[in-house]
Amino acid sequence: METRVACITIIVENAESVEKMNSLLHDAAQYIIGRMGIPYREKGINIISIAIDAPQDLTSELSGKIGRLEGVTVKTTYANH
């Protein structure tokens, strides 16, 4: 199946959602190229960037599931190729 490279940017404002988010990311681990998390303690949020190379349907589904978590905002950007 054809894959597309994408960057999923996640902002977590509710720490209680982190465990479920990590479980969703673990399920997609075979497609994840890399992950960077930045705790922004002054604002009480976490900023996470995920580089992924997966079928577009899987990336979209993952992004949607993460975005439905309470206190979590997500945006996905796809490479042109």
Protein language model features and the residues they cover:
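Long, contiguous binding/interaction regions
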Residues: 1-81
